[in-house]
Amino acid sequence: MDGQGSTTRISFRNDYSEGAHPRLLQALAQASADQHPGYGTDRHTAHAVALIRHAVAQPQADVHLLVGGTQTNLIAISAFLRPHQAVIAVDAAHIATHETGAIEATGHKVLTVPALHDKLTPALIRPVLAMHGNEHMVQPRLVYISNSTESGTLYTRAELEELSGFCRANDLLLYLDGARLGAALTADGNDLDLPTIAALTDAFYIGGTKNGALLGEALVIVNPALQPDLRYLIKQRGALLAKGMVLGAQFAALFEDGLFFELAAHANAMAQRLRAGLLAAGAHFTSDSPTNQQFIAVSAQQAAQLALRHGIGMRGQFEEQTIFEQRRK
């Protein structure tokens, strides 16, 4: 049965419609049996932070465990920018399309550009900088990217190095949304890793919600200039979780023995198995995604038939074709 009470043979709806991996639930059960100080000052959170610092090879990184992706983006971006400053992102970026104007609600404009495969490049950013050169317009200050992207594509090491160098040369901050960073780092063809991402960005987050956790994202701030006083803003935004051990226990379990990457690799493998079968059946994919996100174009009639039997997310409808987004865990 799906969440609406109808019979569903297989659900491809998303990678976060179930609870959590059993090992994370076990870690939570064990942690909940003890008494803990609140607001992320517990031993589980301290252990998780140490593990993440080790994984990203940044012992001085500031690590904050938060509940969800929109919350993490809002807190990070609003903290990093002055009131007159803006974000540059692709037009399909999550902060520009699926976060209900959360960034704009903090007073920061999101400047969007169309991009091939949903990836930003220096060539796309230069015109934005040229158009915003004085105090009569917002000042571009932060470049927002995601890996994997909204269409499941990946940044290569060379692309991220070029983008990072451009940002540093132009006094721009580089922030990476890692809601599906696990899927990106374990996908076929990927040549990035956590230490490289940490070295090339000012801040990024590691997504747990869409990678087997009950909830949770780990915000990693590498740039020391962006680190002071963030807990004040987290509290002010209502995001300082009283039962912080709920996040700490999960991220400790994810990073103690490689479970984070194990779960991501499994999701990718299942998605590629699905993709191979659908390609053999003649399906048309709108994106060449090596991750657990797969996008398929079908007719309106096919869409209706599929929706009756399977849980599948609809991404959009264009000229009698419906784009279905299928995700595997």
Predicted segments — roles?
Residues 21-69, 91-96, 102:
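Conserved N-terminal alpha-helix of the aminotransferase class I/II PLP-enzyme fold
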Residues 82-83, 272-329:
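Conserved C-terminal alpha-helix-loop-beta "cap" of PLP-dependent enzymes
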Residues 80-139:
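PLP-dependent aminotransferase-like
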Residues 12, 120-178:
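Active-site phosphate-binding strand-loop segment of PLP-dependent enzymes
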Residues 87, 110-111, 174-176, 285, ...:
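Hydrophobic beta-strand scaffold residues
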